[in-house]
Amino acid sequence: MRFASLFVVYCTFMFLDISHVKCEVEPVPYCKVITWYDVKCGADGNKTCVDHLIKGHIYDVPVCDCSELTTSGILCTCQHRFPCKEPPPLHRISIRKQIRG
């Protein structure tokens, strides 16, 4: 009986000790991506930007903000969760060419 009582007391203290431990959890950083496309935002600009990014197999599921440019095209400012991935080199070159000329 004595060992059973000690075991119950031990388990109770272990439960209290474990339940009061505070963990420091670091927030997962967002990755910011800004891309330009020669289309219109339309009724749902967020969906337009997400569709273009997924179509190019660049990012998994970004959250985007679509801004119409005064000249032509749209500017998609997107954020998605870790891990941050750079666009493929060919995509960056095509974006730069579109912006410059």
Swiss-Prot record:
Top-rank taxon: Eukaryota
Disulfide bonds: C31-C84, C41-C66, C49-C76, C64-C78
InterPro entries xref list: SCRL
Subcellular location: Secreted
Pfam family, one: SCRL
Family assignment from sequence similarity: Belongs to the DEFL family.
This protein's name: Putative defensin-like protein 253
Native species: Arabidopsis thaliana
Species lineage: Eukaryota, Viridiplantae, Streptophyta, Embryophyta, Tracheophyta
Gene this chain is encoded by: SCRL15
